[in-house]
Swiss-Prot record:
Keyword annotations of the record: Ribonucleoprotein, Ribosomal protein, RNA-binding, rRNA-binding, tRNA-binding
Keyword rRNA-binding included in the entry's annotation: yes
Subunit structure, as described in the record: Part of the 30S ribosomal subunit. Contacts proteins S9 and S11.
An MF annotation (GO) of this entry: mRNA binding
GO biological process, one term: translation
Protein's UniProt keywords contain Nucleotide-binding: no
Family membership: Belongs to the universal ribosomal protein uS7 family.
Superkingdom assignment: Bacteria
One Pfam family matching this protein: Ribosomal_S7
This protein's name: Small ribosomal subunit protein uS7
SUPFAM superfamilies found in the cross-reference section: Ribosomal protein S7 (SSF47973)
Organism: Fusobacterium nucleatum subsp. nucleatum (strain ATCC 25586 / DSM 15643 / BCRC 10681 / CIP 101130 / JCM 8532 / KCTC 2640 / LMG 13131 / VPI 4355)
InterPro entries reported for this sequence: Ribosomal_uS7 (IPR000235), Ribosomal_uS7_bac/org-type (IPR005717), Ribosomal_uS7_CS (IPR020606), Ribosomal_uS7_dom (IPR023798), Ribosomal_uS7_dom_sf (IPR036823)
Function summary: One of the primary rRNA binding proteins, it binds directly to 16S rRNA where it nucleates assembly of the head domain of the 30S subunit. Is located at the subunit interface close to the decoding center, probably blocks exit of the E-site tRNA.
Length: 156
C-alpha cells in the first residue's frame, strides 16, 4: 500500500455526440499516443457500423454490451501464513466499469478483423449477445471465484 493519501479522481467530460462520460472513458481507452480525435472517429464510426449491421441504435448496443461485460465478482490475492490464496470479493461499481472498458479494448485489439472500427463494432455486437472474448474473460473470472469459494471467509 502507498503511504501517501489516495489520489484524487479526476472527472472526465461527457462526449460530444451522446453526452455520456462512459463513452469518453472508452474513447480515452481506445486512444493511442494522445490522438483523441482519431479515437473518437473510431468509436463513432463503430457506432454507425453497428447501426448498419444490426438495425438497432449503436449506443443502445454499446450500453447493453458494457452491462454484460461488467463483472460482479473477482479474485484478489491474499497472503496468509506463507501461502497465497485467491480470495473471491465483490467488485465495486466504479471498478466494474473500469474492468469492463479495459477488457473491451484489450480483446477488441486482439480480434482478427481488419481495422479498429470493424473490430470494435464486432466485439460490441458479440458482447451485447453474451458472446465474444470479453464475455469469456468475465466467465473465466467467475470460474476462478467459484473454484476459490472456500477462501471467501478471508476478507481482503
Amino acid at each position: 500500500m502507498s503511504r501517501r493519501r489516495a489520489a484524487v479522481k479526476r472527472d472526465v467530460l461527457p462526449d460530444s455526440r451522446y453526452s455520456d462520460k462512459v463513452v469518453t472513458k472508452v474513447i480515452n481507452s481506445i486512444m493511442l499516443d494522445g490522438k483523441k480525435s482519431i479515437a473518437e472517429g473510431i468509436f463513432y464510426s463503430a457506432m454507425d457500423l453497428i447501426k448498419e449491421k444490426t438495425g438497432q441504435e449503436g449506443y443502445d448496443i454499446f450500453k447493453q454490451a458494457l452491462e454484460n461485460i461488467k463483472p460482479q465478482i473477482e479474485v484478489r490475492s491474499r497472503r496468509i501464513g506463507g501461502a497465497t490464496y485467491q480470495v473471491p470479493v465483490e467488485v465495486k461499481a466504479d471498478r466494474q466499469q473500469t474492468l469492463a472498458i479495459r477488457w473491451l479494448t484489450t480483446y477488441t485489439r486482439a480480434r482478427k478483423e481488419y481495422g479498429m472500427i470493424e473490430k470494435l463494432a464486432a466485439e460490441l455486437i458479440a458482447a451485447a449477445n453474451n458472446e465474444g472474448a470479453t464475455i469469456k474473460k468475465k466467465e473465466d473470472t467467475y470460474k476462478m471465484a467459484e473454484a476459490n469459494r472456500a477462501f471467501a471467509h478471508y476478507r481482503v
